[in-house]
Every structure is written in structure tokens, then in C-alpha cells.
């Protein structure tokens, strides 16, 4: 909504990294690679910003509470830019040893980096360690070339393969994004009828 607080659509990806078992670094990297494929498969010429969050080195429990490792944080940010595969191959225990157990949540940054090409330009980097966790802001510009159109078309066919022909079945309506959005609006309207003021407006309009 161009008139809203965000100049575009926001699609959140939530990753649980607090209660174990949590995803591996490699799994989140693969999610990022798949996200890139999905973005490239859109027929529209989209402008997309991929954002990631997660505290750098910190630990908030046990005798190691208050742990901070700014040297590791600097190394992590450098590897994220230049050699992300080194981070992909690390185990959660290695992240915990270097950056604290809660600091292992930086693996979420690998979704963002996985969605970018190998060729990125560092636009901005700043770190600040005010108390029990290091904070960083990092901005990359993706310099990767245009996607291979044959590969994009093959991916589109792959996505549609499982449902191909289902929409032609009589009385069958696959829940597409458009239908889901329409149903959400209807369900929101119906749910809001529990609110007296909304119900009164409905009765008056009816």
C-alpha cells in the first residue's frame, strides 16, 4: 500500500531459534536460495529488499551470561560478505562457542545472504556493543546478473506441476493467493462481528 507506513508489501519469515531443536545454518541458507528462486519466478519486474535480524554475540543465561565476543562478530560480518559458505558449514555448537548460545541466532542472517548472488557490494557496515549484545547494521547491494530465463521457466513449471489440471475439475477451487486474500477479508469481517460497534454498523447498513 503506497499510502501506508511501508512503501510496498512486507512478507515476514519467522524462524524459531530459541527452543531446541532449531534449524541448522545450512537449512536457513537453502531457504534463502529458494527464496531467490521464488522472487525470480515472478513475471513482474520486482524491486525486492531482503532483510534479516538476529543479535550478534550474546548469552543471557547460566554462568556464561553477559558473554560478548566482538572479534567473532567482526569475523562473522566479514565472512557473510565475502565467504558465506564458511558460515553455512558451521554447526550450532560452533556458533555457541564463538558467540554465545543465544548468539547462534545470527544464522537467520543466512536467509538474507542466501537470497543474494555471490557478487555483492558492501554499502554500509556499523557495529555497536552497548551492553550485553553487539548490534550491527549491514547493507549489501546485489550485483548479480539477470537470472537465466530457461531456468526460471523450468522452476515455474516445477512449481505448477503438482496442481496442473486440478483447477479444471468440476466444483474444485484450489486456494490460490488471490482466493486466500479474498477469504481473509471475509473472515476478518465475520470475526469483527464480535465487536459491538462493528456489529452495530453491520446491522445499520443491512
Where are the regions a protein language model picked out?
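Charged, low-complexity intrinsically disordered segments
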Residues: 151-206
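Active-site-proximal alpha-helical scaffolds that flank and shape metal-associated catalytic sites
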Residues: 2-4, 9, 13-15, 33-34, ...
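Non-transmembrane, aqueous-exposed alpha-helical and coiled segments at domain scale
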Residues: 33-48
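Beta-strand elements within well-structured catalytic alpha/beta cores of enzymes
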Residues: 13, 46-56
